[in-house]
Amino acid sequence: MQGWKTIVGKLMSRYDFPLPDLSVQAEDKILGGVPTRIYTPPDVADPPLALYFHAGGWVMGSIDEEDGFVRTLCKLARTRIFSVGYRLAPEFRFPMALDDCLTVARSVLETYPVQSICFIGASAGGNMAFSTALTLVSDGLGDRVQGVVALAPVTVHPDSVSADNRDRGEYTSYEENDRLTINTGSAMRSFFDCYGAPPDDPRLSCLLHPGLGKLNKVYMAVGDADTLRDDVRLMRDALVALEVPVKCDEYPGYPHFSWLFPSPALREHQALFFGNLLSGICWVCE
């Protein structure tokens, strides 16, 4: 796992995409003991609120590594965003990261008592977005949960996928896309092992959460060459069955995190992705 951290750290230090938009005000604070960076869009009075949870398989990633991306979201969506520096596994195992996310969420809810929050995250951060929102719903705060925006999120542990889903061929992306994306099947297994959550715990496998039908709105996006493709499809289908308003964009041929690869060949794809993402955030927040 240390090798993964070293490789990704080198990549993130070499490439800074998108470039940080310095017109967005950023302030570092400690909320309830948790490092948090607060991004405020320029020239917007009383902007909507969102929490952002970075990617990294619960074992790596940081506020700094996704600073440029969150600044872009803040400005385009005209939303005040709180980026959460939650503790990482394996040093801090489940549910410590989730506890940090909930601490920041509750702090923001107390600071802005008349506003609801949109929960945004990518990959493992998408899992944190669902889990934080659903925990607040379970705690009777569903009216303060505006919705979830999850990009290629983990929604279920492979060991907790139902036999019916497997028999119908609805969970095959771990095998089909194993060598097509950075988050290979073996890498995902390592991430789950380090995180240490029981496979059937609904705070990890949010697809199984009893409060799923109480979410307000959900937007998701994923590439169909991603191992997490079927996590998104299963969550989409579950939300539809529960009559939760959901929108989902799928990108044929694209792997995990293609929206942030610094390649000129991906400019058209990334323009489409960011346009759809902006529409999704605005739809959830309206």
From Swiss-Prot:
Enzyme class: hydrolase
Classification via InterPro entries: AB_hydrolase_3, AB_hydrolase_fold, GDXG_lipolytic_enzyme
GO molecular function: carboxylic ester hydrolase activity
Induction data: The genes forming the sterigmatocystin biosynthesis cluster are co-regulated and induced on oatmeal porridge or the fungal isolates were grown either on oatmeal porridge or in YEC medium (0.2% yeast extract, 5.0% corn steep liquor). Expression is positively regulated by the cluster-specific transcription factor aflR that binds the palindromic sequence 5'-TCG(N5)CGA-3'found in the promoter.
Pathways per UniProt: Mycotoxin biosynthesis; sterigmatocystin biosynthesis
Keywords: Hydrolase, Serine esterase, Virulence
Catalytic-site annotation from UniProt: 123, 226, 256
Disulfides per UniProt: none
SUPFAM superfamilies: alpha/beta-Hydrolases
BP term (GO), one: sterigmatocystin biosynthetic process
Gene3D superfamilies in the record: alpha/beta hydrolase
Enzyme Commission code: 3.1.1.94
Reactions accelerated catalytically: (2S,3S)-versiconal hemiacetal acetate + H2O = (2S-3S)-versiconal hemiacetal + acetate + H(+); (3S)-versiconol acetate + H2O = (S)-versiconol + acetate + H(+)
Annotated family: Belongs to the 'GDXG' lipolytic enzyme family.
Function: Esterase; part of the gene cluster that mediates the biosynthesis of sterigmatocystin (ST), a polyketide-derived furanocoumarin which is part of the most toxic and carcinogenic compounds among the known mycotoxins. The first step in the biosynthesis of sterigmatocystin is the production of hexanoate by the fatty acid synthase (FAS) units stcJ and stcK. The polyketide backbone is assembled by the non-reducing polyketide synthase stcA by condensation of the starter hexanoyl-CoA and 7 malonyl-CoA extender units followed by cyclization and release of norsolorinic acid.
Name assigned to this protein: Versiconal hemiacetal acetate esterase stcI
